[in-house]
Amino acid sequence: MLTDTLTIRHYQKLTDSLVEMWNRGYRYDDLRLFLDGYLAALRHSNSLEPYQIHRLEEETTRYIYDPSNFEMPQPQPQVDYY
């Protein structure tokens, strides 16, 4: 579980970007490459502690491989009563 506010912000940005990329047609391999690049940039910038980056990677990887995060919502069929 993420507790640091800056780490949570990065998590929210990452997951929003991943869903947007999924909706554009990118798939798991592309999402993983995006995540790897994002984490490499965080490591290079030293904006987070290494243990926070590791936690962020674990949580985001778990998010990527949960298929329910990328399902399109299905509208409820309306029943007409006459």
Indicate residue ranges for each PLM-predicted region.
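Generic L/I/V-rich hydrophobic alpha-helical segments across diverse proteins
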Residues: 18, 35-39, 53, 60
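Intrinsically disordered or highly flexible coil/loop and linker segments, enriched in small
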Residues: 24-27, 48, 69-70
